[in-house]
Amino acid sequence: MKILKWLSVADRFYKVYLDKQLAPYGINSSQHMFLVKICGSPGIQQDSLMDMFYVHPSNIVRTIAALEKQGMVTRSPSDQDKRTWNLYPTERALSVIDEIQDACKRTEDILTQGFAEAGQEMFGDFLMQAGKNIAAELHIERKEDEFND
């Protein structure tokens, strides 16, 4: 039960910390990963985010709507499939994405404080494998290597 307890503790408190870091930009710890990906891949299809983040499509729709309302993202219908959207960062998003990524890096640094560099890499690999293990047990399939960083 030690693993479950400390995963829960780390999850709750990193979100509290990251929310405080991201508040000046009008986003939160549930939205940052979407914005980072959209800024790094302008025009990305909204549907592809499901495979990257292991979240339900309705969560993606709500998150993108919130980012759009905050002036961080714009949507346009996909030329290939009119049922989905291509997502683009706004100038506002591009102007703050470096600070957002810095806040994420600081949060990861705090989580891995006291770890050797190799230990930090292993910790990330172990967490990724743990996530894939539980997803597989629940028969949740995603495309491999879509967002392994």
Regions found by a protein language model. Give the residues of each.
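Short, locally clustered residues in the helix-turn-helix/winged-helix DNA-binding domain
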Residues: 8, 36-40, 101, 128
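Membrane-interacting alpha-helical segments
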Residues: 56-57, 86-90, 143-149
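Charged, amphipathic alpha-helical coiled-coil/dimerization segments
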Residues: 65-128
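Surface-exposed, interaction-prone regions with an acidic/low-complexity signature
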Residues: 1-5, 70, 86, 110, ...
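C-terminal regulatory/oligomerization modules of transcriptional regulators
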Residues: 118-149
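N-terminal leader segment of winged-helix/HTH proteins
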Residues: 1-25
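Alpha-helical linker/hinge and terminal dimerization helices associated
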Residues: 10, 14, 53, 96-112, ...
